[in-house]
Every structure is written in C-alpha cells, then in structure tokens.
Amino acid sequence: MARTKQTARKSTGGKAPRKQLATKAARKSAPASGGVKKPHRYRPGTVALREIRRYQKSTELLIRRAPFQRLVREIAQDFKTDLRFQSSAVMALQEACEAYLVGLFEDTNLCAIHAKRVTIMPKDIQLARRIRGERA
C-alpha cells in the first residue's frame, strides 16, 4: 500500500491523547535496553529479627576464639607475666563471658522497653548493672 500525505482534520471533541512525561518514557525504555536490575533489599528490621531468631536457636560461641584469647592474655599480663593457659581454661572463660554478656543485654533490653524505647542505649546498660548491684 502506498503512503499518502495526511491532512489535518477538525476534532470532534473527544479526549486528546496525553503526552507521556519524559521520565516515564525513560523509565519504561531503560529495562528494555538491558538495564541493570537493582538488588533486592529487605525492609528495615526484617534481617534483624531473622538474626535474633537464628542466634537464639544456636549454641555456638559468638566471639572469635583468637581475639578473645589475646584479650585474656593481655589482661593476665597485669597480674603475672609468662602465664600459660590450657585451651579448656580459655574456653571456660569464653563461655562465662558470653553468658554474662547475653544476660546483661537481656536486662538492658528490658530497661529500654521500660523507657518505652526499642533501641538500647548506654544508660540502659548502666541501669541494668546498677540494679544488679555490680556498679554503684
């Protein structure tokens, strides 16, 4: 079929087709041209709740062994030089430390909730320790 020149005709009052905004047109054409898909992100708090459930289920130690052992040796240097530790002694210290910290954070969370907050703050830790009688 041969192309013919179109002539202008008078409108009959129907709605005129809208012009698309430049941004909308660009947005539609970008993925078609092999655009990079942005990575999936979870809503704030979702990953935190998943981690809470995961760590509450688990029983493994959460502090790495080597850094904890270095800390123990550094503290022990103040009392006596050239101290030697059995590996089971360091493990027992680590178990006790982690149990203490977990309990302290539980009490700290209760202090934050009591203050009608969900974020723990240093003042919550101080209050928890004061109530426990560890610090005046």
Swiss-Prot record:
It is found in: Nucleus; Chromosome. GO terms for molecular function: DNA binding; protein heterodimerization activity; structural constituent of chromatin. Phosphorylated at Ser-11 and Ser-29 during M phase. Phosphorylation of Ser-11 requires air-2 but not air-1. Dephosphorylated by gsp-1 and/or gsp-2 during chromosome segregation. It comes from the Eukaryota. The modification N6-methyllysine is found at residues 5, 28, 37, 80. The modification N6,N6,N6-trimethyllysine is found at residues 5, 10, 28, 37. GO terms for cellular component: nucleosome; nucleus. The modification N6,N6-dimethyllysine is found at residues 5, 10, 28, 37. Its main location: nucleus. The keyword Nucleus applies. Residues 1-43 are annotated as: Disordered. SMART domains: H3. The keyword GTP-binding does not apply. The modification Phosphoserine is found at residues 11, 29. The nucleosome is a histone octamer containing two molecules each of H2A, H2B, H3 and H4 assembled in one H3-H4 heterotetramer and two H2A-H2B heterodimers. The octamer wraps approximately 147 bp of DNA. Interacts (via N-terminal tail mono-acetylated on Lys-15) with swsn-4 (via Bromo domain); the interaction is direct. Core component of nucleosome. Nucleosomes wrap and compact DNA into chromatin, limiting DNA accessibility to the cellular machineries which require DNA as a template. Histones thereby play a central role in transcription regulation, DNA repair, DNA replication and chromosomal stability. DNA accessibility is regulated via a complex set of post-translational modifications of histones, also called histone code, and nucleosome remodeling. Belongs to the histone H3 family. This is Histone H3.
